[in-house]
């Protein structure tokens, strides 16, 4: 009998650790069981997935269900049942665990649901199906009996076929599918009734085998790893709050398994632990090992609560290779009333102190999260939270929108919060008592601008100037979102270069409006017209505001610090007057390398193509060296020079 565990991932680079864990555990308990894994993505053509499943000819198909793939999976299930009518289809995962009876009532093609953790439940299901197979039901695809034993064909799954009762006939107990002894399942009986049994016992994580015995198939993909399950916290929007039991895998197992990844030079290992640092000894044991055995390549991703870091943990982070680890830190809100209402325990002062400390090391990528749509948080309150988190200088600021997950405490408070949300996955907030849908739309626009202009990491110099121009960080993205909407730019896939052009036009228009305000407010002399203002010269001693020329320089810097671009934007200044200086610089580097020390064997013309020297409107030159890149951001090395005309010397500025 063939079992297929099917995972529909969001992207190709993702993998599904759940199905691998189920297979690994079942194989240790039932050696020889024929269990395959089929991994697909929601970007696959559904027809191709259907074809692949059909060619495998599984007798049992288990689908791993989440909010982002459940609709896709149910479409596949309905078609699979048409082409493989005898296949038993089971579902598992958080999206079906909390209303399993409703799912079965709604989806007649599904035989059953594995609720909660699935390793033990799936193994017992495999054993039950194999026990039924011992009666040698003929293979539904070839007509040949399983294991070569000729037996009379029976239809164990037909809804109208009467199954023998206990005690009827020889082997009566083995020729029917006996599921009543399996905890953690909700299933449809042969008569069509839906039955549900109590929860499955929780395994020790040490009982679950390491499922990455072979790295073939994981090339260029994120590898997921689990060193703990559960969460000690009770955040109302999260399913982890339901079970506060936290279990840890012994370090005696964890450390050799991490060495396996290091030996295979896996690019990234993402820990799926809900709060990785909730147990100090566990955290330090793993991090010390990674520091001592660093291969210089592998990056490890952790979800942490930064406010519970102690001095020893922070000092250890400071000793790490740049890029060895990255941290995802859930802040969600800085509104005290909101934090209290969602049952979140967080010391914002300690959190900020820890984030600032790690930032100062400049060796660890930090990803900070916010959630819009939480109780007691209106538009202005969320913007204050946004500004607070932005000022912590995260490498990425992730704006999420509340998902009302089945089984969560948040779902119970829908009426109290006047919470409206999408009726289909991912059940995202539409409005609350504090946040109307009109403000949700505004925040969606802000989210888009944050992704493009901040999280992309492609505008670092320009963002610093924008922070000077606007009073609050949030104003940058609010104004950009309004500009996109006003000019019909929203919802369009723009090229990288186009994003720079749009930002420049936005600044140009914004400064013109400010220019008009200045002119209107200026006192006009009786003998002449209004004073002529130009955006080029907007910087002045009174405001210290950057000029349009400053932004032009910063945008060119941001473009070249990422890559040696071939196409220049329309706002780029003419570089032809500086050909002589550029040529002389590279000739000097060829003769006596001072700055381009990694270009031995290349002549000045080749260097000029491999590196780039840009004249800026402030009179300086910036050298971009693409052989020297920042290990954290990936940006090219950049040095600013002043050219001393006549002396033909370059001085770093």
Residue ranges and their predicted role:
Residues 1-2, 182-224, 637-640, 646-650:
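N-terminal [4Fe-4S]-dependent radical SAM core
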Residues 1-20:
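A short, flexible N-terminal coil/short beta segment enriched in small residues
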Residues 2, 25, 29, 34-147, ...:
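Glycine-rich beta-alpha loop elements in corrinoid/cobalamin-binding modules
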Residues 2-8, 46, 59, 156-159, ...:
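Radical SAM enzyme core and accessory elements
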Residues 3, 35, 89, 182-183, ...:
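Hydrophobic/aromatic residues located in beta-strands of well-ordered beta-sheets
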Residues 26, 61, 185, 231, ...:
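Conserved, mostly hydrophobic/aromatic
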Residues 57, 280, 292-295, 299-308, ...:
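A structural motif corresponding to the C-terminal lobe/cap of the Radical SAM core domain
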Residues 206-360:
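Radical SAM [4Fe-4S] cluster-binding motif and immediate context
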